Design a protein with these regions (language model features):
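Catalytic-site beta-strand/loop segments enriched in glycine and acidic/polar residues
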Residues: 126-155
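Catalytic core of membrane glycerolipid acyltransferases/transacylases, capturing the structured
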Residues: 44-115
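A transmembrane-helix-recognition feature enriched in membrane-embedded lipid enzymes
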Residues: 1-36, 96-106
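A cross-family acyltransferase "interaction/gating" segment
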Residues: 145-210, 237-244
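Acidic, Ser/Thr-rich low-complexity intrinsically disordered segments
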Residues: 239-273
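A charged, well-structured terminal subsegment
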Residues: 121-129, 191-221, 225
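Helix-to-loop junction immediately C-terminal to a conserved catalytic motif
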Residues: 12, 19-64
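Hydrophobic/aromatic ligand-binding patch that stacks against planar heteroaromatic rings
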Residues: 102, 125, 156-160
């Protein structure tokens, strides 16, 4: 088990500022629409130990096509509100010798191997306290670059805590690093990353979680479609980073499902709930 430092907001800010510096270094262009749906700017005192938005907590549901999606969502919220989001992260990441201490110091919520009930309860409590919990509801990278089936945890947490779900669709960050395509400085140089923030989704405690989750999936995919429509980079024929249905080289949905099933439940995103 790696060293587990105490939660430290200064460490979180160092991580975010490092990310901002890397964006400036590579001159990455982040293009955002729907910012009016984000929480209002932070109104706490600048030296307050708690960085929370002024309107209460929310679940931030993020699409997952590449390994840097979480980072761009984090930078988006930080730039707009100075909110420090807490992510649900796997036990594997928490146990990693390098990532583990960072997960602990940043105050993220760890989902254990056997059961996620403790993490779920901890996340709901943080939401009630005004924190922003970020979730990748697809529970794994979608190699078809279409939003795949989502777990119900995001909407269930939001309903139990009485907070909205904010859908965040990210397109283009998968070009920088994703499955079978490692980081390339050449691709990152002046790369565009497109983000669309959907309207907050309010889920009542009596609503069907599966139906609400499927609606959330549709909202996230609509955001992706909007991002693709005005993405400032023309893909070549059969570009690997484009969906098959748009002439790209990514696997079709059927091929993606077969590949996920072949890898087993853990690599494919685990047991659906």
């Amino acid at each position: 088990m790696p060293w587990q430092p105490r939660h430290n907001d200064r460490f979180y800010r160092v991580i975010v500022r490092t990310g901002l510096a890397l964006c400036r270094l590579f001159q990455i262009r982040v293009i955002v629409t729907g910012q009016e749906h984000l929480p209002p700017p932070l109104i706490d005192a600048p030296h307050s130990p708690s960085r929370r938005a002024s309107g209460g907590g929310a679940v931030v549901a993020i699409t997952h096509f590449g390994y840097l999606d979480f980072a761009f969502a984090e930078l988006l919220l930080w730039r707009h509100t100075r909110v420090q989001m807490r992510f649900l992260v796997t036990q594997g990441a928490a146990d990693h010798w390098f990532a583990g201490p960072a997960v602990s110091a940043a105050g993220h919520v760890v989902v254990g191997y056997e059961t996620g009930s403790h993490a779920y309860d901890a996340a709901v409590q943080k939401l009630r306290e005004g924190e922003y919990i970020a979730i990748l509801p697809e529970a794994g990278v979608s190699r078809s670059f279409r939003v795949r089936e989502c777990r119900t945890g995001a909407v269930r947490m939001a309903a139990e805590a009485g907070v909205p779900v904010i859908p965040v669709s990210i397109w283009g960050s998968h070009r920088l690093m994703t499955r079978r395509h490692g980081f390339s400085p050449a691709r990152a140089w002046r790369a565009p990353v497109r983000i669309h923030v959907g309207g907050p989704v309010l889920v009542g405690p009596s609503e069907d979680a599966r139906r609400a989750t499927e609606a959330l999936r549709g909202t996230l995919q609509a955001g992706i479609d909007a991002c693709i429509a005005d993405f400032p980079l023309e893909p070549g024929p059969g570009a690997w980073w484009m969906p098959a249905e748009l002439g790209g080289g990514a696997p079709t949905e059927e091929e993606r499902q077969q590949l996920d099933e072949a890898e087993g439940p853990r690599r494919a995103g685990g047991r659906r709930r």
